[in-house]
């Protein structure tokens, strides 16, 4: 009996044990596409949740990106304003030239009352002075020849501007016929006699 029982039993070897199927390795060409596919599913879930929620406003993707950019811009206005000012200062050549001129500009010379009086007296006599006369006048007043030259240039410009303003004021005065009727024979009648009357007498 024992021999028959042993022969009827089957021995299972370890190699024949059924093992679960091993997961095949993911090919390298599909590894790079997995994150993008996951992102697609996440975006689909988010869009699906927006559609199912009636109280949540649906915002398009382009508008959402613009709103995110606007929120990041207004989150730090001081930094954006500072960067804009720096860009404007560096990109504007007029500002750079103005700064360089202000840095190169020499301090204004203050003349004393004695120097101004002497220069005014000389200007009444002659409006243009030669280089030698400028040197002599500068030595007498304790100035440089360049300072004397600039003073005369400014004084001539001031005199010319005053003459133009006076002419403009006279041109704006309205004509008064009563003033003209006070001189029926003209203003020249009070002056020298005409040549015709003198020849007749």
Swiss-Prot record:
Any one GO biological process: nervous system development
Location, primary (coarse class): nucleus
A Pfam family assignment: Homeodomain
Record bears the keyword Nucleus: yes
Region of interest (Disordered), ranges: 72-94
SMART domains, per the entry: HOX
GO cellular component: chromatin; nucleus
Disulfide bridge positions per record: none
Residue range(s) of DNA binding per entry: 104-163
GO molecular function: DNA-binding transcription factor activity; DNA-binding transcription factor activity, RNA polymerase II-specific; RNA polymerase II cis-regulatory region sequence-specific DNA binding
Highest taxon in the source lineage: Eukaryota
PROSITE patterns: HOMEOBOX_1, HOMEOBOX_2
Keywords: DNA-binding, Homeobox, Neurogenesis, Nucleus
Annotated function: Probable transcription factor that regulates neuronal differention, including synapse assembly of the cholinergic motor neuron M4. Activates expression of growth factor, neuropeptide and transcription factor genes, such as TGF-beta dbl-1, FMRFamide-like flp-5 and transcription repressor zag-1, in the M4 neuron. Required for pharynx peristalsis.
Sequence similarity: Belongs to the NK-2 homeobox family.
Full protein name: Homeobox protein ceh-28
Organism: Caenorhabditis elegans
